[in-house]
Amino acid sequence: MASTRIREARESDCGDIMRMIRELAEFEKLSHQVKISEEALRADGFGENPFFHCLVAEIIPAPGESQGSLVVGYGLYYFIYSTWTGRNVYLEDIYVMPQYRGQGIGTKIIKKVAEVALNKGCSQFRLAVLDWNKKAVNLYKFLGAQDLTESEGWLSFRFEGEAMRELAGR
């Protein structure tokens, strides 16, 4: 029987990760917002000073099966800093291919990110989810995450493109 393992991504995984980034964006109805390329992903995550870290979920075939291993999910994260609580980790993306959902793979990725965070001395593990993605919302709550919009009233903002250039005076 095939098994699943969660491991650190390698540079050679960038094609699979980029494919899944596009699949996630399509699922979120935001595919028009994906601007990065596989080359940018490779440079930003696997250079001397990576901007992010990534885990992949890999299906390992049972002994005697002819197919090779298959990357079916990923979790892309980075470290941030809170002036209130110190070191934190932020899970930017978590994705499992639809045909592999419901097998606990997403939970394994989340647990591995939590393990990494604790090993790095982080006090919090943060992530965001679209409000209509009820399966993900329910999973995060089941795993013990707190909805900060509900409990503390936090809203999330971003500056991008022209607004960011204008703000910087460029």
Curated annotation (Swiss-Prot):
Sequence positions that bind substrate: F27, E28, E92, E152
PROSITE patterns: GNAT
Top EC category: transferase
EC number: 2.3.1.-, 2.3.1.57
Single Gene Ontology MF annotation: diamine N-acetyltransferase activity
Primary residence: cytoplasm
Binding sites annotated in the UniProt record for acetyl-CoA: I94, Y95, V96, G102, Q103, G104, I105, G106, T107, N133, K134, K135, Y140
Localization: Cytoplasm
Boundaries of every N-acetyltransferase domain copy: 4-166
Biological-process GO terms, alphabetical: nor-spermidine metabolic process; putrescine acetylation; spermidine metabolic process; spermine acetylation; spermine metabolic process
Stated family: Belongs to the acetyltransferase family.
Descriptive protein name: Thialysine N-epsilon-acetyltransferase
Organism, as annotated: Mus musculus
